Amino acid sequence: MAATRYNSGDLRRQVGSPRAKNRDTKETLCRNVVIYGHCRWEDSGCTFNHDQNKASVSQTDLNSNRRVFNVESPSFTPANQQQSAGKKSTFSSQAASAAPFTPRGVGTSTPTLQQANDSTIFNPAAIREFTPQNYDVGNTISQNGAQHVTQDGGLYSDPFSISSLGQTMPPQGQYNPYANDPNNLAGAGAGLYQPAGFGNGLVHPPNYHLYQPPSELYRPSLQPYQRTTYDFFIPKDRRENLQKKLFHMQQLLPNSGLPNLDRWHSLFPLDTKATRNSTCFGYPSWMYKAQNNKNGRHFALRRIEGYRLTNEKAILNVTKEWKKIINANIVTVHEAFTTEFFGDSSLIFVYDFHPLSETLYDHHFPPNNSHNRLRNTNKIPENLLWSYVCQIANALLAIHNAKLAARCLELSKIIWENNRIRLAACSILDVLHHDSPNRKTIEELQQEDFVKFGRIILALATNTPTLNFNNIDAALATIVPRYSTQLRGVLEWLIKPSAPGETKTVETLLGGITTHLANFANFVMQESDEKEFHLMRELENGRIARLMFKLSVVNERGDSCGVHNWSETGERLLLKLFRDYVFHQVDADGKARLDTNHYLNCLSKLDASSEEQILLTSRDNATVFVVSYRSIRQMLDRAYGELGKESKPSATGATI
């Protein structure tokens, strides 16, 4: 390799400051200070500036003086011409951060010549710092330079807040959360958040995982007498399902454009498809969730679009008969009325609202998103089909005994929730066809109910929608290898016409499926026992909550009952020490001990007035008491009773 042309001593020698080139040398920061942190010739004649703070200020002043005459600007404009045009050369702090003005249209108040002159002036103060696009919406500046205060009350706000994100989201179509499969909501929390199109911003549902227990695969080995924290509360699946129901019941759709009816407000669309479908009723129909103004309850509204009522007695007579039917497998009908709030003549039916329900069609024939076809699901268990048979038969028994007919028996008009089905479109066809000249008799309509009943079960058994049936006999033959002959016999009896002189009845059907009725009743009673067991455990949790109310009322109370510092005197002091014993324990390192089992154990013993004795110690370790749970419970009741004597009764009259 070629030898270097410099000596090693020259490389180690510090390079001197460059020679001054202009009159601003004293304001220029020395290069040695920038590179090495100091200058060797600072006291030996170096004419450059060696004070970094002074250099930054001087450089700022220098730049401000050079704003008007900037060699990098596109063109040169004298300063006097600016002032003659009425343009100020100074900028306020608020105007410096103002966004560049962009005219909305051609017709602006500024002349074209003035715009051309202003565009050639380079204004460094008007250049804003970089902020993420579409997120700088927390603060807005008006045209006069005044800055508006956000809703939070502060001058500055978080640009990534939920309210800011909602303002920047592009408008999208109305989002319907019921279009998703409810089963997917429980998986890994993926379906627990609404998409961006829902409302004006991101909507976060409750945190269902607050009491989520660990996986059963890693459940610790416990003795028979030991319990985990989650054993004291309602099971996670049942609790999560109930919380989802409450959440969907209170769900709103802001700016939906739906009107408020006379006694109904907060309408929320429930249809999973936005297409008009008039197959069942002959008119397009829509489903909404609404809240009643009088009682605050939520109901389901079925709207028949474009129907003009000609006989008011049709609504009164039909709804009067259907309101009498109260059945576990029928959605109760409350009333019907007409309205023009939707811009047309619509007929509204009011039903009970069952959150998290979906139609039987959507549950068993979900669409395949990739091919937009009905996905061929797996075989439906036979015991589930028999469960559907028993439930629909129960509904038809109540309807036929009331001298009525279900009429609208279709997969899309039966709602499903955890293998519980309900007929959800009763009474509608009775009103629509009330004055029809070709109206059939009740006996004929009841016989049609059996045929529609059989076609529903056959569609589920063959994984084929009812509308795709071309040959009933061929469809019945396909279920023989997969299901029992008894199920096929029931379907043939339902679908095929009866022999001359015979009439199908629900009693005859129930007589042929008694074994399955007994199995279904056994399953329902076992589920009822399980719910009662969990309800009893929640009852104990309610007793603990009442104890917590009493302890919170007594502890840390000031002057009361004519006694100064009442909660710190007498036996009330023991209640405070007991509170510390239960909730304020620490470990050997002085850190807080968080043990839910300890909380529940102590409060349960206090509720039971156990004779077990515990050691209560003051915070300064100067006072020690040995007392039983029974004594503490008596002290708590006496202290709460003293407060009750001097207090006024509550407006609701509720007591603990």
Curated annotation (Swiss-Prot):
Location in or out of the cell: Cytoplasm
Keywords on record: ATP-binding, Coiled coil, Cytoplasm, Metal-binding, mRNA processing, Nucleotide-binding, Zinc, Zinc-finger
Keyword DNA repair tagged: no
Zinc fingers typed C3H1-type, residue spans: 24-53
Coiled coil location: 515-553
Presence of the UniProt keyword Glycosyltransferase in the record: no
One of the GO biological process terms: nuclear-transcribed mRNA poly(A) tail shortening
Molecular function GO terms recorded: ATP binding; poly(A) binding; zinc ion binding
Annotated binding of ATP, by residue: 275-280, 302, 352-359, 412-413
Chief localisation class: cytoplasm
UniProt cross-references to HAMAP family, sorted A to Z: PAN3
Domain remark from Swiss-Prot or TrEMBL: The N-terminal zinc finger binds to poly(A) RNA.
Listed name of the protein: PAN2-PAN3 deadenylation complex subunit pan3
Organism from which the protein derives: Neurospora crassa (strain ATCC 24698 / 74-OR23-1A / CBS 708.71 / DSM 1257 / FGSC 987)
